[in-house]
Amino acid sequence: METWSVDQVCKWLVEKNLGELVPRFQEEEVSGATLLALNDRMVQQLVKKIGHQAVLMDFIKKYKQGNQELKPTGGPADTSTLTPAQAAPEHEQNPSPTSHGDQTSLYPAVLDNRLIDQRVLKQRRNVKHVLARHKALQWTKSYILPEFPYDVKCMLVEQKRPDHSMRIRIIEFLQADMTKYLEGSLYPTTQQYNDVVNALLQAHPFLDEDGCGFFLWKRALKDRFKYIRRPIEDDEQVMRNKCKFGHRRGQTRKSLADIQSNEIKIVQIKEESAHLDSEVDEHISWFQQEYMKTERDWREVDKRMSQTLEIRRKMIGGQTPLKDILKMFPFLKCPYQMFREVQILTKTDIYKKTRHILESYSENILTAFSVLDNPINTALQEKMKHYTDEGVLKSPEVLKNMKMTATCLLLPHVFGDEPSLFVVVNGKVHVSTPVLEVKNPFHINGCEFSLYLNKEKLTKVDDCVTALAALVSAFRVFGIECPRRLSQTFNFLETLIFDMQSPQFPSLKEKEIRSQPPIT
């Protein structure tokens, strides 16, 4: 490895399922000698993800140990004949005594001409595989927690309840440690998840919150591995495994030929887009110029957006970066154009349907048992009382808008989803998927709604109906998959908006209207 070139190092990274690191290693011109000279701090600067850091350092450490443990051969004459065996680590050449005894009883290890029998080498490789598997099984029964950072250890010693960021740090270190023990594998078994979480809760029982801590920590650990696995979804070996074992239960398995056919279609779409650039270039230039004007010709905008719909859908389906899409078609930032695109694609007036949902389900959601003590509901009650005392709530339309705003903000709470993936109230956006930002939600004149995409403000809207319709439209128009922790809320909305099936509204049987005076 010391004599490897940069290309050889990159090839080795791909073989070790670390192909994501190749561009960075090429940029820094990391050769074999440089790779072996890396220390922990250098690896942290070179590799972003903590899981990849752990795997890379473990591979380097094992190589150095194996290199030091290699024993010199008897003489120069034997060097050429023993080269294949010397290339392997010592434990591969010298398995356990029992295994070695079995091998010598089957085949002579060394022939008369001092050459190693290839059948023996094959048996030794098989023994290595069995030993590695046995080692993994042993690990699952006696897992030892890693050495946590100083601040995490202080929190554990003081038995403080960890906040969200501290939970993430603990999970990251557990995931990195498991990956190291699993020799780079990102697919632990259920038993291995159980053993790790059990070890954590046995060492620190206060983390088991109300007896439900085991399932919460296990789910968080599983989600962390899913997040780490995302960058390798397009890896050739991963695609082969999906093809072999099936990606989802009940899903039709795709052959490798089908996968390659899909890849060819994507390439064809991109090539077709390139050829059509000359035809749509005039439209794109016009869009960019018209978007900068204060008074726009909306009839012409609608006409040209319809003419470029096909190429736009192909580009979005071909995974063209959203920044490029929005640069070429800036009017997609306008809620009206997003609603129009949804109407063309689904034959649905999304604004009208969204308004109907907020009006129809407002009372049910605001009186649902799961949100009675929610801070948003409490803030609504206080503002309504304040405005009533001042005589501001004379218009029924103002009261109706306040209730619909609260309904919009409470949707993920009612369905048990993650609210920060849906709306951020008086805070900062931290997610890349479409999300709403709301400032001063119940202020009659100072309430502000904005739609964010990739942590950047896409557009500012006037009211909660437009905001919610724009949020649902953004996922549809830009082909973005809904986050799993928001699936229940979006299933409810899309079911009603696109008339897919009758939705199941949770917690209506649990609501206790008598525990809170009705909103009038």
Curated annotation (Swiss-Prot):
InterPro entries xref list: SAM, SAM/pointed_sf, SAMD3, SAMD3_SAM
Gene3D superfamilies, alphabetized: Transcription Factor, Ets-1 (1.10.150.50)
Source domain of life: Eukaryota
Biased composition (Polar residues): 94-104
Region (Disordered), start-end ranges: 67-104
Residue ranges annotated for the SAM domain, each copy included: 4-71
PANTHER family: STERILE ALPHA MOTIF DOMAIN-CONTAINING PROTEIN 3
Name recorded for this polypeptide: Sterile alpha motif domain-containing protein 3
Protein encoded by which gene: Samd3
